[in-house]
Curated annotation (Swiss-Prot):
This is GPI-anchored protein LLG3. It is a lipid-anchor; GPI-anchor. The gene is LLG3. It is found in: Cell membrane. One of its GO terms (biological process) is positive regulation of reactive oxygen species biosynthetic process.
Amino acid sequence: MKITHHCLVSLLSILLLSGFAFSHHISLDEFESHPSTSRALLQAKATCKEDFAAKNYTIITSKCKGPNYPAKVCCSAFKDFACPFAEVLNDEKTDCASTMFSYINLYGRYPPGIFANMCKEGKEGLDCTDVTPTSSSHASIPLVSTHVLLITVSILFHLF
């Protein structure tokens, strides 16, 4: 999957225009896995326009470490990373949430469902009102081939 200059300009325009209307919560539904049904072709999700392959996940992986995975530290780091993307993560018509979690698990090698089980703040999901966007969650990962990562995540996603 190659990102063209036109796609990048379109993505940046959309992000710029939607920056003022982002959600202040990450829905709990995005943490849960949804079983596939026989109508999978009719329910296919659109590809996420946010390039989660190029994000810097060290904001999570440098703070949330095993074997104990302290909930307060891990959830805070997760919110710092994910809250700037709350609007796209809550869009159930796209695969943004599953894509982001695939990369988080790829880089952090976290146990399945760790953030879903630990990070709960209410019926609307995680509250992002107290999280300020940082440039680190939007930074690119240097020296890593996006194509190799995309293939790896695709293989892992299909295996599990």
